[in-house]
Amino acid sequence: MNLYAVRAIYKFEMARTGRTLMQSIISPVISTSLYFVVFGAAIGGRIQQIDGISYGAFIVPGLIMLSLLTQSIANASFGIYFPRFTGTIYELLSAPISYLEIVVSYVGAAATKSIILGLIILATAGLFVPLQVAHPAWMLLFLLLTAVTFSLLGFIIGIWADGFEKLQLVPLLIVTPLTFLGGSFYSIDMLPPFWQKVTLFNPVVYLISGFRWSFYGIADVSVAVSLAMTVVFMAVSLAIVAWIFKTGYRLKT
């Protein structure tokens, strides 16, 4: 593996975070803090505990996941789309660097930025509600797997998009609604039986459930199932990325 090339692209993408600090870090943290103020303090005080956990603390994993998913997609999609937009993708594809190294560089940088953001939001949440992390190693594992998986999805979107407006299409119309309906603000056990079954078709349910289990030891679905589904999502994303490079789909257009 050409580690010099990987490191160069990785450092370039990480440096972009410093140039867009307001958009990449500060804005998501402020937005999430507003959720804590509105749902955790104002509304949470009027809601009973869920599985013995205060409502403000209960929504912390879901809010971290909400930011993690959207920012992973945004970071990776813009990272690979911008070279296509400016035409520098040709230099990248003709350079002595493999497709694997390109993916590792862009996806690795996007995942790193998202994980840093997730940890900052976790620290910020501690200012609003008392927190406990029952399984910190599992928490970091779910954080890593989810960030990588959705960075891969963002990479795919960046290749598919033919305009800046399409970069926001999937996050706004698909990912964000699925996250809100995936148990970010409630346990799916609170839903009627029919909707509980329907909700299980939402892939984000498994991510949030497994991540919440790492905090409080409670989950809407089996932890093993959550982990397995996360790995499946990652494998599917990797397969699509491999197909893109094999066929050259929209790499030069």
Enumerate the predicted regions with their spans:
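Hydrophobic transmembrane alpha-helices and immediately adjacent juxtamembrane helices
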Residues: 1-136, 141-253
